[in-house]
Amino acid sequence: GNAIDIAHNIKVAKNLTDVHFRGEYWRTPKKYHNLTKTSVYSVPEFPDYPFLDPHWIIRVDGSCEIGPNAVPVFSPYGYDTAENIKEFIPKVFEMLGSGARKAIFDKQFQELAFSEIQSSMSKSVMIERVKKFLPKINPKEITEKGTAGIRSSVINENGKFIPDVILLEEETSFHILNYNSPGATGALPFSAHVINQLHKKSLFESEDIEAQCGPWKFNDIIEKLEK
Protein backbone atom coordinates (compact mmCIF):
# COMPACT_ATOMS: atom_id res chain seq x y z
CA GLY A 1 0.00 0.00 0.00
CA ASN A 2 2.91 2.38 0.61
CA ALA A 3 5.14 1.27 -2.27
CA ILE A 4 3.92 4.00 -4.65
CA ASP A 5 4.23 6.67 -1.94
CA ILE A 6 7.83 5.66 -1.25
CA ALA A 7 8.62 5.79 -4.98
CA HIS A 8 6.96 9.19 -5.37
CA ASN A 9 8.93 10.59 -2.43
CA ILE A 10 12.16 10.07 -4.39
CA LYS A 11 10.65 11.20 -7.72
CA VAL A 12 10.19 7.69 -9.14
CA ALA A 13 7.11 6.38 -11.01
CA LYS A 14 5.41 9.78 -10.96
CA ASN A 15 3.31 8.66 -13.94
CA LEU A 16 1.67 6.00 -11.76
CA THR A 17 -0.75 6.18 -8.88
CA ASP A 18 -2.59 3.64 -6.76
CA VAL A 19 -6.13 3.15 -5.55
CA HIS A 20 -7.04 1.13 -2.48
CA PHE A 21 -9.73 -1.52 -2.14
CA ARG A 22 -10.85 -3.27 1.05
CA GLY A 23 -11.81 -6.91 0.68
CA GLU A 24 -14.28 -8.16 3.28
CA TYR A 25 -15.32 -11.70 4.19
CA TRP A 26 -18.10 -13.50 6.03
CA ARG A 27 -17.53 -16.75 7.93
CA THR A 28 -20.07 -19.52 7.47
CA PRO A 29 -21.42 -21.76 10.26
CA LYS A 30 -20.20 -25.36 10.52
CA LYS A 31 -23.30 -26.76 8.81
CA TYR A 32 -21.89 -25.41 5.52
CA HIS A 33 -18.34 -26.73 5.90
CA ASN A 34 -19.07 -29.81 3.79
CA LEU A 35 -21.14 -27.99 1.19
CA THR A 36 -18.36 -28.40 -1.42
CA LYS A 37 -15.05 -30.24 -1.56
CA THR A 38 -13.15 -27.32 -3.08
CA SER A 39 -13.25 -23.54 -3.22
CA VAL A 40 -15.57 -22.21 -5.94
CA TYR A 41 -14.80 -19.14 -8.04
CA SER A 42 -17.26 -17.34 -10.30
CA VAL A 43 -16.54 -15.48 -13.54
CA PRO A 44 -15.87 -11.82 -12.61
CA GLU A 45 -18.63 -9.39 -13.56
CA PHE A 46 -16.04 -6.74 -14.46
CA PRO A 47 -13.15 -8.61 -16.16
CA ASP A 48 -11.29 -5.40 -17.09
CA TYR A 49 -10.47 -4.83 -13.43
CA PRO A 50 -8.09 -6.89 -11.27
CA PHE A 51 -10.70 -8.23 -8.86
CA LEU A 52 -12.39 -11.55 -8.30
CA ASP A 53 -16.06 -11.45 -7.42
CA PRO A 54 -16.99 -12.84 -3.98
CA HIS A 55 -16.43 -16.57 -4.01
CA TRP A 56 -16.63 -19.66 -1.80
CA ILE A 57 -13.39 -20.29 0.05
CA ILE A 58 -12.34 -23.39 1.98
CA ARG A 59 -9.52 -22.57 4.40
CA VAL A 60 -6.76 -24.98 5.39
CA ASP A 61 -8.50 -25.66 8.72
CA GLY A 62 -11.70 -26.71 6.92
CA SER A 63 -13.64 -23.55 7.74
CA CYS A 64 -15.44 -21.72 4.94
CA GLU A 65 -15.78 -18.05 4.07
CA ILE A 66 -17.58 -15.93 1.50
CA GLY A 67 -15.71 -13.02 -0.06
CA PRO A 68 -14.00 -10.82 -0.82
CA ASN A 69 -15.67 -7.78 -2.27
CA ALA A 70 -13.55 -4.79 -3.38
CA VAL A 71 -14.72 -1.65 -1.59
CA PRO A 72 -12.93 1.59 -2.63
CA VAL A 73 -11.19 3.21 0.35
CA PHE A 74 -8.83 6.17 0.68
CA SER A 75 -5.93 4.68 2.60
CA PRO A 76 -3.91 1.45 2.68
CA TYR A 77 -5.07 1.35 6.30
CA GLY A 78 -8.69 2.28 5.57
CA TYR A 79 -10.38 -0.26 7.79
CA ASP A 80 -12.46 2.32 9.66
CA THR A 81 -14.33 5.55 8.95
CA ALA A 82 -11.90 7.79 10.84
CA GLU A 83 -8.90 6.70 8.74
CA ASN A 84 -10.81 7.15 5.49
CA ILE A 85 -12.04 10.62 6.47
CA LYS A 86 -8.48 11.65 7.36
CA GLU A 87 -7.10 10.54 3.99
CA PHE A 88 -10.11 11.47 1.85
CA ILE A 89 -9.05 14.95 0.66
CA PRO A 90 -5.35 14.23 -0.06
CA LYS A 91 -6.19 10.98 -1.85
CA VAL A 92 -8.91 12.57 -3.98
CA PHE A 93 -6.58 15.39 -5.04
CA GLU A 94 -3.87 12.84 -5.87
CA MET A 95 -6.29 10.83 -7.99
CA LEU A 96 -7.68 13.87 -9.82
CA GLY A 97 -4.14 14.92 -10.71
CA SER A 98 -3.18 11.54 -12.16
CA GLY A 99 -4.37 8.88 -14.57
CA ALA A 100 -6.76 7.66 -11.88
CA ARG A 101 -8.99 10.59 -12.85
CA LYS A 102 -9.88 8.81 -16.09
CA ALA A 103 -10.64 5.62 -14.19
CA ILE A 104 -12.93 7.14 -11.55
CA PHE A 105 -15.01 8.91 -14.20
CA ASP A 106 -15.33 5.74 -16.28
CA LYS A 107 -18.92 4.48 -16.25
CA GLN A 108 -17.95 0.83 -15.81
CA PHE A 109 -15.67 1.66 -12.87
CA GLN A 110 -18.47 3.67 -11.26
CA GLU A 111 -20.80 0.67 -11.64
CA LEU A 112 -18.18 -1.58 -10.03
CA ALA A 113 -17.59 0.85 -7.14
CA PHE A 114 -21.33 1.21 -6.48
CA SER A 115 -21.82 -2.55 -6.54
CA GLU A 116 -18.94 -3.15 -4.13
CA ILE A 117 -20.08 -0.43 -1.73
CA GLN A 118 -23.52 -2.04 -1.70
CA SER A 119 -21.98 -5.41 -0.85
CA SER A 120 -20.15 -3.79 2.08
CA MET A 121 -23.26 -2.09 3.45
CA SER A 122 -25.45 -5.16 3.06
CA LYS A 123 -24.45 -8.70 4.02
CA SER A 124 -27.28 -10.09 1.93
CA VAL A 125 -26.11 -8.29 -1.21
CA MET A 126 -22.68 -9.94 -0.98
CA ILE A 127 -23.95 -13.39 -0.09
CA GLU A 128 -26.58 -13.31 -2.86
CA ARG A 129 -23.71 -13.00 -5.35
CA VAL A 130 -22.38 -16.37 -4.16
CA LYS A 131 -25.86 -17.84 -3.79
CA LYS A 132 -26.18 -17.66 -7.59
CA PHE A 133 -23.93 -20.73 -7.84
CA LEU A 134 -24.46 -22.15 -4.31
CA PRO A 135 -28.23 -21.75 -3.81
CA LYS A 136 -28.32 -23.68 -0.51
CA ILE A 137 -26.70 -20.80 1.37
CA ASN A 138 -29.05 -18.86 3.66
CA PRO A 139 -27.81 -15.30 4.38
CA LYS A 140 -29.74 -15.21 7.67
CA GLU A 141 -27.57 -18.03 9.05
CA ILE A 142 -24.31 -16.19 8.35
CA THR A 143 -23.60 -13.71 11.14
CA GLU A 144 -19.84 -13.66 11.75
CA LYS A 145 -17.51 -11.36 9.86
CA GLY A 146 -14.19 -12.71 8.63
CA THR A 147 -10.84 -10.98 8.24
CA ALA A 148 -10.65 -7.95 5.95
CA GLY A 149 -7.62 -6.97 3.88
CA ILE A 150 -6.67 -4.00 1.71
CA ARG A 151 -4.94 -4.24 -1.67
CA SER A 152 -3.58 -1.32 -3.66
CA SER A 153 -3.84 -1.49 -7.44
CA VAL A 154 -1.67 0.64 -9.71
CA ILE A 155 -3.15 2.83 -12.45
CA ASN A 156 -1.09 4.28 -15.29
CA GLU A 157 -1.30 7.73 -16.88
CA ASN A 158 -3.96 6.47 -19.30
CA GLY A 159 -6.32 5.49 -16.50
CA LYS A 160 -5.77 1.76 -16.99
CA PHE A 161 -5.25 -0.75 -14.19
CA ILE A 162 -1.89 -2.45 -14.60
CA PRO A 163 -2.34 -6.23 -14.26
CA ASP A 164 1.28 -7.24 -13.62
CA VAL A 165 3.98 -6.57 -11.07
CA ILE A 166 6.29 -3.63 -11.84
CA LEU A 167 10.02 -3.72 -11.10
CA LEU A 168 11.81 -0.36 -11.30
CA GLU A 169 15.55 -0.05 -10.88
CA GLU A 170 17.05 3.34 -10.05
CA GLU A 171 20.63 4.27 -9.30
CA THR A 172 20.21 3.97 -5.54
CA SER A 173 16.90 2.16 -5.18
CA PHE A 174 14.89 -0.81 -6.40
CA HIS A 175 11.09 -0.68 -6.37
CA ILE A 176 8.51 -3.46 -6.46
CA LEU A 177 5.08 -2.06 -7.31
CA ASN A 178 1.66 -3.62 -7.82
CA TYR A 179 2.56 -6.97 -6.23
CA ASN A 180 -0.75 -8.39 -5.04
CA SER A 181 -2.47 -11.70 -4.51
CA PRO A 182 -2.91 -14.09 -6.24
CA GLY A 183 0.57 -13.40 -7.63
CA ALA A 184 1.89 -13.11 -4.08
CA THR A 185 1.33 -16.84 -3.64
CA GLY A 186 4.59 -17.24 -5.60
CA ALA A 187 6.47 -15.16 -3.04
CA LEU A 188 9.51 -17.41 -2.56
CA PRO A 189 10.38 -17.84 -6.27
CA PHE A 190 9.68 -14.15 -6.85
CA SER A 191 11.93 -13.18 -3.94
CA ALA A 192 14.69 -15.32 -5.43
CA HIS A 193 14.19 -13.57 -8.78
CA VAL A 194 14.47 -10.11 -7.18
CA ILE A 195 17.61 -11.06 -5.23
CA ASN A 196 19.14 -12.48 -8.40
CA GLN A 197 18.45 -9.26 -10.32
CA LEU A 198 19.96 -7.15 -7.54
CA HIS A 199 22.98 -9.45 -7.42
CA LYS A 200 23.51 -9.24 -11.20
CA LYS A 201 23.46 -5.44 -11.09
CA SER A 202 25.82 -5.35 -8.08
CA LEU A 203 23.13 -3.76 -5.93
CA PHE A 204 23.27 -6.72 -3.57
CA GLU A 205 26.26 -8.83 -2.61
CA SER A 206 26.09 -12.25 -0.99
CA GLU A 207 28.41 -15.22 -0.86
CA ASP A 208 25.62 -17.49 0.34
CA ILE A 209 24.25 -18.45 -3.08
CA GLU A 210 23.68 -22.00 -1.85
CA ALA A 211 21.12 -20.75 0.67
CA GLN A 212 18.22 -23.08 1.36
CA CYS A 213 14.87 -22.63 3.12
CA GLY A 214 13.12 -25.93 3.68
CA PRO A 215 12.75 -27.54 0.23
CA TRP A 216 13.64 -24.25 -1.49
CA LYS A 217 17.21 -23.90 -2.73
CA PHE A 218 18.19 -20.53 -4.17
CA ASN A 219 20.35 -21.82 -7.02
CA ASP A 220 17.76 -24.38 -8.13
CA ILE A 221 15.01 -21.76 -8.24
CA ILE A 222 17.12 -19.33 -10.27
CA GLU A 223 18.13 -22.05 -12.71
CA LYS A 224 14.48 -22.94 -13.36
CA LEU A 225 13.37 -19.30 -13.62
CA GLU A 226 16.04 -18.50 -16.21
CA LYS A 227 15.31 -21.45 -18.49
Protein language model regions, located:
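Mid-domain beta-loop-alpha active-site segment that forms a flexible
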Residues: G1-I4, M126, F190
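Flavin-dependent oxidoreductases
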Residues: G1-I85
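Generic solvent-exposed, charged/amphipathic alpha-helical segments
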Residues: D5-A7, I127-K131, I195
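A broad structural signal for alpha-helix termini and local helix breaks/kinks
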Residues: H8-I10, L134, H199-S202
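Flavin (FAD/FMN) cofactor-binding core of flavoprotein oxidoreductases
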Residues: N15-G23, R27-K31, K102-S181
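Dinucleotide-binding/catalytic capping subdomain of oxidoreductase cores
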Residues: D18, C64-S124
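A conserved FAD-binding loop/helix module that cradles the flavin
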Residues: H55, P68, Y77, F174-L198, ...
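Active-site-proximal substrate-binding core of FAD-dependent oxidoreductases
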Residues: H199-K227
